[in-house]
Regions:
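Catalytic cores of glycan-processing enzymes that make or break glycosidic bonds
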Residues: 1-219
Length: 219
């Protein structure tokens, strides 16, 4: 792996590009340390970042050399995740490993922990914790408090989509990578619709640390 990473680093230097390693899941600890030492970014997903007792990890303890995001293509977008769609979908597909009620209860506890964290950290108004759109924006606002080098917002979150683009553990059971982009009401969205909608502008403002997003020169 030394030679392969060396070649990747050299080509990235020549192209003035970043390399991001997908080091989620069952990856040995030395891999993350090695990526950091060689200047390659790892991957951090908010729902997977937890402290020693399983509590939401404080922003200050997130890795610096990583690309941080709220969700990933292997999970439903934030609005779907907050609604428990990731649990119900696996149940419908017959790939849920625990009773549905237990999984939903665990998801509710996870969500409650994060809501409490967002409110305590001042990125979510207590009065808005029942509004999934406001929670989604607050989750991204939390990312800005981490030291992570690169922050990522998903297009599906920007438009309010709820459906997962990919469901691990399936082949023909789910239309992986064939889900048309839609807003939170299920209406399909074209590229022009994305630029005209309000939610993408709100999320862009959050990611830029602004109260509102400036008018784009592309519109």
């Amino acid at each position: 792996h030394e030679a392969m990473v060396g070649i990747l680093a050299l080509e990235a230097k020549r192209a003035q590009a970043l390399i991001v390693g997908e080091d989620l899941g069952t990856v040995e600890p030395w891999v993350r340390e090695y990526l950091s030492r060689r200047g390659l970014l790892g991957t951090s997903v908010l729902w997977f970042e937890a402290g020693m007792q399983g509590e939401p990890l404080d922003a200050q303890w997130w890795r610096e050399y990583c690309m941080a995001s709220v969700t990933t293509h292997d999970l439903p977008p934030s609005l779907g995740y907050l609604a428990g769609d990731h649990v119900r979908l696996r149940d419908q597909l017959g790939i849920l490993t625990e009773p549905l009620s237990d999984e939903l209860a665990a998801a509710a506890r996870e969500q409650a922990d994060w809501l409490g964290k967002l409110v305590a950290d001042g990125v979510l108004d207590e009065a808005k914790r029942d509004d999934p759109v406001e929670v989604m924006l607050a989750l991204h606002r939390f990312l800005l408090r981490t030291p992570s080098k690169v922050l990522l917002a998903n297009l599906t979150d920007a438009v309010g989509e709820r459906r997962a683009q990919n469901q691990p553990g399936t082949i023909d059971e789910y239309p992986n990578w064939r889900v048309p982009l839609a807003d939170q009401n299920g209406h399909r969205m074209s590229l022009e619709d994305v630029f005209a909608a309000q939610l993408p502008q709100r999320l862009a403002a959050v990611m830029n640390g602004l109260p509102e997003q400036p008018v784009s020169r592309w519109t």
